[in-house]
Amino acid sequence: DYWGNPQVVDATPRSSDGQLLFLMEMVSKMKSSRGGEKGSRIASVHNGSSLFTGDAGSGESNIRRHIIENDWLDAIIQLPNNLFYNTGITTYIWLLSNNKPSERQGKVQLIDASQMYRKLKKNLGSKNSEFSPQDIATITQAYLDMATIRGQLDAKGEPTGIASQVFANQDFGYHKVNIERPDRRHAQFTAESIAKLRFDNSLSDAMNTLYEQYGDEVYQAEFYTKYKNDLKKWAESEEMGLSLAQRKKILDIETWKNQLAIMNHAKTLWEALGDVLYTDFNLFTKKVENVLKTHDIKLKANERKQILDAVSWYDETGEKVIKSITTLKADKIQALCERFGCQPEQLADFGYYPAQDVGVENAKPDQYVIYESSSELRDSESISLNQGIYDYFLAEVRPHVSEAWLDMESIKIGYEISFNKYFYQHRPLRNLDEVANELLQLDKEADGLIRDILGG
């Protein structure tokens, strides 16, 4: 992983696209290049999804990472459209080798040969293009020379000819890291918010449907015997879309009783705290804990969270929600700074805020506040392996979002290859006089229709 720890990761692509799985099958059959052996070479045709489908940490990305970090990817050649029978999609040839010559080691060549073709005299389904012998020779020579060739535009501004670039393996890699912002919440007990607690969050719609039809009967054991067949048929209906585990859960009386107990506990809190609107969620949770303690109500962590989530919501005017206040001695601060590559005064950029600086009463110098992050405001950045994560944060994030911090534990390593990124050529806008003359010519051909439309 990012910290250098070995890990077992997913290397299975999605079931709808098995191209990379077939490629890995071929990789597994490669002969060894050790002990003077020649090793193996692979040429495999893919569509564009193999280049970039899958986020960091996904099966597709991990397969690309495995191939590139082992230095097996030699080159990728983009082919012209309509080169294959019955498909017009863009295709690519992946060239792999486990015995690269020294000059190609640690590098990957990308060749854009999408404009290297000649038209067939007669179409074969979607196939209307082919390589000429000269095209093949040009592509082969570009590969053998490991040449860097700049793409060209013709007189009409359209791409023409071949283009080629050579990259270091790590140029295709990136770190994906979460950018967190503090949660700010308002809270208020209301009849509507408490009523929602009657139902489990994961089964809210289904439980509501059942309760509307049968009411408080759902809390009686004989209900599940009396309507056993009807309930089973209802739960298994395609309309409800319930999994086996969900069907079992919703037809278990304990599920209903547990939710009823949670709702009643919330009513107790409501009676004690009233319907006051709290703009400081930290104060609100303290009051909730005091009421629970006074009434000797013991809630599981998930039950407590369900109540708090039901009666609170994000509001940018609220106070920041404190997750915890921790004590960091000098050795712990040094360890964190070494891990994050920062100075003690920069720990706030990694989610550790000096308690004295953020207004915590009676805070000690070695106490730090850790805020709850807002899932609604969470963002992620993809940062090249060639750039430091913290340097990127200071340059691209901190100037725009002062409250943001890096979640360094969320880092995932990804790999993707974008031909458009490397071979895109800007096409200059056409001259206005040229456009006007073309319109006038079309006007003549259309018997003045365009002139009438333009009011001229």
Write out the residue ranges for each language-model feature:
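A conserved structural/catalytic subdomain of Rossmann-like adenosyl-cofactor enzymes
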Residues: 1-451
